[in-house]
Amino acid sequence: KEWQNYGIALSRTTMANWVIKAAELWLKPLYNLLHQKLLTANCLFVDETTTQVLREPDRKATSNSYMWLYRNSTDVDQQIILYQYSPTRAGENAEKFLSGYTGYIHCDGYEGYNKVKNVTRVGCLAHIRRKFHEGVPKTSTGKKSQCEIGLDYCNALFSIEKEIAHLPPEERLKKRKKKAIPVLKAFWGWVETTNALPSSVLGKALSYAKKQKPYLMNYLLDGECQI
């Protein structure tokens, strides 16, 4: 409308093309530079979420596409957060974006991340905690349920991380090992000895925890890693 006030008629298509061209000329080189910088990080955090795109060629407007997010650790001076659009959730997206990277990647249990090679994968306790939380009774029964016990273990580990969050990575790792390892041993012992129907909420939570154990325990390797 501002252009119209000057007697210049511009279509939405023309203005959209301006934005696209400006992004290609000025923003894409900056994005590529940040991408290169990101791949030098010690730790990366990766996630993907659904989104919908209108008028995408050969796809319905209701089709799910994905926005991938990559960021470095909060311990570094220069924070970098990059988004990448993809019409699919295929693991090849992360594999291509992280090509050449050999550090730690924090991600959930999505098997597509197995496509990323030569990295140390770090699991997410929040996803394990969520599984147990789903089985907590809505009303108190006086005695803690097994899901509540699992939730308590997760909360204890998160409390430790909250206590040591202000420390530099090296000191944080020392405190983490001292405080968290006993809790982790008790937690995994409980996971292995607790019985539940595989189809129950508790059974699914225990199964998920067992599958994620090798990845979750990797947060004990570096103070820059998160739980």
Task: Please state what every model-predicted region is.
Residues 1-227:
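Catalytic center-proximal scaffold of phosphoryl-transfer enzymes
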